[in-house]
């Protein structure tokens, strides 16, 4: 049985009451349970390595849920993602990644990368 894993990459910088969107990308992917997927979020207008960066997700009909963060040399994960998900940065490409392994049906969600 397959399930749909969708994500939206969204990196925003607040400027007063305005929000400048630096990147928006949407895509839907069919992934087999137990499969793997790597998300990438390329940022512009700021340096990924100088900021705390996070992934959050929203499952169908539910609120936003924190997935993982990276700050300096430290990484943080929600308990249910430890050992399955790995957050990382590519400073040379100013890009944030989320490697997701051993995917489950309950991982079906819209994924957001955020500053």
UniProtKB/Swiss-Prot annotation:
It comes from the Eukaryota. Immunoglobulins are composed of two identical heavy chains and two identical light chains; disulfide-linked. InterPro entries: Ig-like_dom (IPR007110), Ig-like_dom_sf (IPR036179), Ig-like_fold (IPR013783), Ig_V-set (IPR013106), IgHV (IPR050199). GO terms for biological process: immunoglobulin mediated immune response. Residues 1-19 form the signal peptide. Probable non-functional open reading frame (ORF) of V region of the variable domain of immunoglobulin heavy chains. Non-functional ORF generally cannot participate in the synthesis of a productive immunoglobulin chain due to altered V-(D)-J or switch recombination and/or splicing site (at mRNA level) and/or conserved amino acid change (protein level). Immunoglobulins, also known as antibodies, are membrane-bound or secreted glycoproteins produced by B lymphocytes. Residues 114-115 are annotated as: Complementarity-determining-3. One of its GO terms (molecular function) is antigen binding. Residues 20-44 are annotated as: Framework-1. Its main location: secreted. Residues 45-52 are annotated as: Complementarity-determining-1. This is Probable non-functional immunoglobulin heavy variable 3-38-3. Residues 76-113 are annotated as: Framework-3. It comes from Homo sapiens (Human). Residues 53-69 are annotated as: Framework-2. Keywords: Adaptive immunity, Cell membrane, Disulfide bond, Immunity, Immunoglobulin, Immunoglobulin domain, Membrane, Secreted, Signal. GO terms for cellular component: extracellular region; immunoglobulin complex; plasma membrane. Disulfide bonds join 41-113.
């Amino acid at each position: 049985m397959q399930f749909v894993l969708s994500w939206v990459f969204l990196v925003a910088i607040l400027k007063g009451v305005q929000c400048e969107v630096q990147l928006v990308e949407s895509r839907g992917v069919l992934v087999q349970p137990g499969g793997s997927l790597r998300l990438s979020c390329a940022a512009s207008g700021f340096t990924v390595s100088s900021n705390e960066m996070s992934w959050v997700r929203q499952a169908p009909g539910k609120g936003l849920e924190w997935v993982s963060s990276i700050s300096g040399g430290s990484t943080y994960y929600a308990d249910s993602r430890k050992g399955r998900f790995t957050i990382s940065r590519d400073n040379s490409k100013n890009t944030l990644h989320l490697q997701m392994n051993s995917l489950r049906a309950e991982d079906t969600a819209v994924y957001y990368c955020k500053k």
